[in-house]
C-alpha cells in the first residue's frame, strides 16, 4: 500500500497516489472496521474533491450503509456533525497542502480521533482489498450520493 495513515488520515497527490480505486477501497475498509450503517462525508473546494468523494461514498456504502453528503464544508463542521450525530465521518481535503494534493481525514463516531488500533486495522483491510479488487474501477461505477 503506497499511502498510509499520517495524522488522522491519508494524503497524497490526487489521481496519482490518491486514486479513485484507493479511495473506494479506503471507504470499504473503513465501513468494515466500524460496521456502521451511516456515514457523513464532507469535502473542500479542490477540483479533485467531488469525484474522490463519490468513490469514497461508494466504498462506504458497499457494506450496506447509508452515506450523507455534507457538501462543501470546513473540516471542523464535519467533526462537529460527527459528534452530534454519533456517526463516523470522512472529510475529503488536504487542508493547507498544495492544490494538487488531496486527502481523507476520518473521524470515529462522536467526532473522535481514531485509535492507533483502528488505523492499523483499516490499513490492513486496505492492503487485503487492494490485493483482491480488480485494477480498474471506472468512473461509470461511481454512483452519485
For every predicted segment, state its role:
Residues 1-66, 137-145:
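An N-terminal, well-structured beta->alpha segment
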Residues 13, 104-145:
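Gly/Ser/Thr-enriched, mixed-charge loops and adjacent short helices
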Residues 31, 37-112:
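Ferredoxin-reductase
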Residues 21, 86-88, 94, 118, ...:
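Mixed-charge, polar/low-complexity N-terminal
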Residues 21-32, 76, 80, 120, ...:
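Short, contiguous clusters of charged residues that form electrostatic/catalytic patches at enzyme active sites
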